[in-house]
C-alpha cells in the first residue's frame, strides 16, 4: 500500500489537532455538577504540649463527595481517630468513630483549574470511646469521664491539586468542636487525602 504525501500530511494534522485539543477537552470534564468522588485521607490531631510528628494519634477517613455548580461540593465521610491521654505513667486511649456531613466552597483557583483553595463547614456525630469503655485504670483510679455519644460542628480548609483529571491530592486543616465531649471539645487536626473522581 502506497501512502501519499497528502495522506501523511492529513494524518500529521489530525495528530497535532488531537494533541492541542485533548487538554482542553479533558479539562472540561473536571468539576462537573453531579460528579462524585471517593476519597481516602489520613490525619494527625494537634494536641497541646505534644510534638506533631512524635505522637501516637492518627485518623483515617473514607469520604464520598458530590459536586455542585462552580466547583462547590458536599461530602459525607466516616472516620476513625485515636490518641492517647497522659495520666501519671499511663496512656489512656481515646478513640472516636465519627460520621461527618459537610459543604466546601472554592475561594481561589489558578487559571487552568488545577489548584483550588476551599473553605467549608460540617456537622458531625459519633461515638467517643475512652479507655476501651473501662472506668478503672490499672492503678485503681476511677475515670470521671466516660465513653459517650458526641455531636458537633467543624470548620475546614483545604488545598486541592488535580494530578490528573480524575485524581486529586489535598492537604487539609480542620477545627472540630464536640459539644458534649468531656475530654477535648476543641479538636484541631491536619490531614492529607487522595480522591478519585468517579
List each model region and its residues.
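Short glycine/proline- and aromatic-enriched beta-strand/turn motifs that initiate or cap beta-hairpins
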Residues: 26-78
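Transmembrane beta-barrel architecture of outer-membrane proteins
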Residues: 37, 57-61, 96-100, 150-154, ...
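Gram-negative (and chloroplast) outer-membrane scaffold detector with strong preference
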Residues: 63-137, 196-198
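Residue-level detector of the transmembrane beta-barrel scaffold of outer-membrane proteins
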Residues: 37-41, 73-77, 116-120, 168-172, ...
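Short loop/turn motifs that connect adjacent beta-strands in outer-membrane beta-barrel proteins
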Residues: 28-35, 69-71, 108-117, 163-167, ...
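Cleavable N-terminal export/targeting peptides
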Residues: 1-34
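Outer-membrane beta-barrel "beta-signal"
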Residues: 186-198
Amino acid at each position: 500500500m502506497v501512502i501519499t504525501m497528502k495522506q501523511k500530511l492529513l494524518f500529521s494534522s489530525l495528530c497535532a489537532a488531537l494533541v492541542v485539543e485533548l487538554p482542553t477537552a479533558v479539562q472540561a470534564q473536571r468539576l462537573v455538577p453531579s460528579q462524585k468522588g471517593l476519597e481516602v485521607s489520613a490525619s494527625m490531631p494537634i494536641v497541646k504540649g505534644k510534638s506533631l510528628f512524635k505522637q501516637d494519634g492518627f485518623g483515617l477517613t473514607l469520604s464520598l463527595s458530590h459536586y455542585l455548580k462552580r466547583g462547590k461540593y458536599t461530602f459525607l465521610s466516616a472516620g476513625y481517630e485515636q490518641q492517647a491521654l497522659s495520666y501519671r505513667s499511663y496512656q489512656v486511649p481515646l478513640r472516636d468513630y465519627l460520621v461527618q456531613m459537610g459543604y466546601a466552597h472554592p475561594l481561589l483557583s489558578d487559571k487552568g483549574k488545577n489548584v483550588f483553595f476551599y473553605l467549608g463547614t460540617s456537622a458531625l456525630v459519633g461515638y467517643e470511646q475512652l479507655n476501651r469503655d473501662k472506668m478503672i485504670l490499672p492503678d485503681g483510679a476511677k475515670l470521671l469521664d466516660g465513653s459517650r455519644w458526641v455531636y458537633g460542628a467543624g470548620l475546614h480548609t483545604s488545598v486541592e491539586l488535580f494530578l490528573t483529571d480524575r485524581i486529586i491530592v489535598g492537604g487539609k486543616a480542620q477545627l472540630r468542636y464536640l459539644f458534649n465531649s468531656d475530654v477535648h471539645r476543641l479538636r484541631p487536626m491536619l490531614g492529607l487525602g487522595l480522591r478519585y473522581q468517579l
